[in-house]
Curated annotation (Swiss-Prot):
Tissue expression pattern: Detected in embryo. Detected in larvae four days after fertilization, in retina and neural tissues (at protein level). Detected in embryos at the sphere stage, during gastrulation, somitogenesis and in swimming larvae, both within and outside of the developing nervous system. Detected in adults.
Organism: Danio rerio
Cell inner membrane found in the keyword field: no
Stated role: Myristoyl-binding protein that acts as a cargo adapter: specifically binds the myristoyl moiety of a subset of N-terminally myristoylated proteins and is required for their localization. Plays a key role in localization of proteins to the primary cilium membrane.
Region (Disordered): 1-49
Primary gene name: unc119b
Annotated protein name in UniProt: Protein unc-119 homolog B
Taxonomic placement: Eukaryota, Metazoa, Chordata, Craniata, Vertebrata
GO cellular component: cilium
Length: 243
């Protein structure tokens, strides 16, 4: 996250573990390969767009369109059933890449099947499984490089050009936009990758405000397959842990 203008809102060069020989890969302890992905560089400015304008389109939303958003979305821009590929995130871990310290980790219990009543409750709650609240200590805002490892499964269909755009805001001020390419995922596969977040130094006055106003730092994570929005997750953040 940083306080740059939207003209410089993205981080380092795109590294696609599936499609590029330059991708960083490590072997996981349980076998298989861990792909490390960096955000795209050199995004150009997009025409500013509002959430209301995107809702009025009446068609699939594209990556270029969400890159025009200048404020956090108040609601979700797609439905749960738009995830026709049955992409399911099963594990998530955040660590400081400089020290290896794990800062946050959560995993979905195995064989976590919803019964009929749970399905009804999920239908009633549009944020079910799509919202996360984080609480970190103030020291998190001093970190320079953070790795976020995600493990996910896909259903019976191949997933092509899987992409995530994640935009962070503080009090509706755009702090940082990340843009990651997952690449191609074969049907019925389990996939693991680590997104590399590179954070420039934040101004001290902005750090103070972010600590003093917990959960006013928010993010939208938009997931696309073949340039069509299929998933939208949200999060908010507090940096006053331990105080």
């Amino acid at each position: 996250m940083n306080s740059q203008s939207s003209r410089n809102e993205t981080a380092a060069t795109a590294v696609n573990g599936s499609d590029s020989a330059a991708a960083s890969r490590d072997h996981k302890s349980g076998g298989g390969v861990l792909k490390r992905l960096k955000s795209r560089r050199n995004q150009v400015d997009r025409r500013p767009v509002t959430e209301e304008e995107l809702r009025a389109l009446g068609r699939d939303i594209t990556p270029d369109e969400v890159l025009g958003l200048r404020a956090v979305a108040r609601d979700y821009l797609c439905k749960l059933e738009d995830n026709i590929y049955n992409i399911d995130f099963t594990r998530f871990k955040i660590r400081d890449l400089e020290t290896g310290t794990v800062l946050f980790e959560i995993a979905k219990p195995p064989h976590c099947d919803l019964d009929e009543e749970d399905d009804e409750n999920r239908d009633a709650d549009t944020s079910a499984g799509r919202f996360v609240r984080y609480q970190f200590t103030p020291a998190f805002l001093k970190l320079r490089t953070v790795g976020a490892t995600v493990e996910f499964t896909v259903g019976d269909q191949p997933v092509t050009n899987f992409r995530m755009i994640e935009r962070h805001y503080f009090q509706d001020r755009l702090l940082k936009s990340f843009d990651f390419d997952f690449g191609f995922c074969i049907p019925n596969s389990r996939n693991t990758c680590e997104h590399i977040y590179e954070f420039p130094q934040l101004p001290e006055d902005l750090i103070r405000l972010m600590i003093e106003h917990p959960y006013e730092t928010r993010s939208d994570s938009f997931y696309f397959v073949d340039n069509k929005l299929i998933m939208h997750n949200k999060a908010d953040y507090a940096y006053n842990g331990g105080q």
